[in-house]
């Protein structure tokens, strides 16, 4: 099995599940036990400032208080997942996804962000997307998703609403021109 860790999942136009319709998901882990990732193109109305306030963290030093928190997926919707650049991981609970991309789930990173000492580039998500062993592979066979290798510049330099089309551009396609009907060969 080829791992899809550090890949994007692009929802095909015919995917009508409201949790994933029109989404770009960044896969953080994929092995024989299952798959885990976060949706990176669904900003919520909740801002980082409001989230930090809910957690009783003073965000006075946080330079990106107005940054939106993202809907990361339908699993563990009450947990924070922070996707960020970096290979030096001083945080309590981090997973190195690629050379320069990691996922952290520990409160110490949110405290550092609130104090203006967090990573320069990051996306805060509430919830994640997860698939049981073999489930994503079945969905791929059903043409539910397209996959392409992940790209840090799309994650951290492209506006959230443009990330899906930017990832599709790597493949040379425009999802708006694709049929809503799934094809199988």
From Swiss-Prot:
InterPro entries per UniProt: AlgH-like
Gene3D superfamilies (alphabetical): VC0467-like
Pfam families the UniProt entry points to: DUF179 (PF02622)
GO cellular-component term (any): cytosol
Family: Belongs to the UPF0301 (AlgH) family.
Protein name according to UniProt: UPF0301 protein Csal_0058
